[in-house]
Amino acid sequence: MDALFVPLAGAVGASVDQVKLISCLLIAYPLGSVFVRIPSDKPTLRHLFNISVSLFYFFPMLGMYTGFLQLLGDILITYFAAKFSSTSKIMPWFIFLFILGHLMFNHIIRVIYDLSYETIEVTGPQMVLTMKLTTFAWNVWDGRRDPKDLDKWQLEKSVREFPSLLEFLGYALYFPGVLVGPSLEFTDYINLVHERTFTAPGKHEGGRRLPAGRKRVGYRKMVTGLAFLGVFVVFGGSNNYSVMVTPWFAEQSWLKRVLLAQLYGTCERTKYYAIWTLTEGASILTGNGFTGFTPSGQSTWNGAANVIPTVIEFPSNFKVLLDSWNMKANVWLRECVYKRITPKGQKPGFWSSMLTFATSAFWHGAQVGYYLTFLMGGFITSAARLARMNFRPFFLPAEGQPITTAKRLYDFVGALVSLLVLNYVASPFMLLTWENSITGWTRLGWYGHVVVMGSLLFFYVGGSGFCRSLQKKRGISSKKVASASGAATPVAEKTFQVPPALDKIVPPPI
């Protein structure tokens, strides 16, 4: 089948693997419309449809025969381990460690063979499947626990009636998300198949329980995803982080290199925006992602989102930027790691955060560049929080007063610094190796480290105390300081893809 894609790959300047992947994502749109036309009272047909489409992706389209057998092995091991050990406390941990260990093994193989990110192989689908299988194991365990011991999420997602093998295969191979996500929980999949998710008061399609508005939102996501893809195809080939390690880049002035890094970072992100937005749209067409109705009765479909590009490109601060990236992975880390490693009756602490971060790092891959990016992320979140706590109160308007020019300027500078730091710290994530990552940072003059570490140094050698005393002298109320600082971040809003922030481990002197 490669012969069909070679001319197109040559025309757009992409690899054959990339073209085949995008083709699978686009094929999912008409197939999503077919899926919803299978009667919901015939769930077996819907499960078989999911399985059949995924087999079509893996075999004739992508040629991932060995890779699929590995995925199938993980699926069957998870299913039977959960089925015959559902009441064992060890079961979810066994599945978690086995599935994550298998993924890490394949990540190492990818490093050994030096496969580029353009090569489509098993680790991409396996990362999604890892989230689904490990979440399922915990959901089954929650279904055997006393409901009084469960929180709201655990109670809603718990699996109390163990599924048939066909149902589980349909879930694991749910076709819109089988290659690159989005991930979803088993209860959500079953509710989708039986159309239990949808309730009045909105309009419905063709007498079915499926709310109207699904196609409008889904195809809008497709257009948006294709637009991002177009940007990447046109500009990404010559504007990416790999240019930073070329002799030409070293010959440019420092200011030009910094400006080019902003362009490279933006272009690199567009491919993720494209893929995740395309899969979100296809998922919506099957009915996944429904989040209710507006007061006017219009349906909303935000539950399948994995990224919010506008928030990332125009962030109010670094935290909201992180919260809007790879959102499904953050939910998985929170529900399947962070909450689970904390003993009952105790509050999560430093080690809970560190082990959750380590899981995130292992899940992403074995390349050194990933770890450089993630480790730096912990310092960035700390510096950003301290800046917000110490600087923001000076710019907040009095209660009941309109936003001032100074506050708008503060927000603009904060967004600009967030993007500058993001495009700096993300470069190792794409350059991958230690040598290339250090070369890239060196040619940028280590400006991200200067900004972040310089800020932390300021706050830790007396800057925090100075700002607090100045706030008191200016009569800034404690209420305004609390408003600027924010309350302790709820578990549901924590970011788990970076290590614990320094200020949470060793607070600066005040």
Describe each model-derived feature in a short phrase.
Residues 1-510:
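Non-catalytic, membrane-anchoring transmembrane segments at the edges
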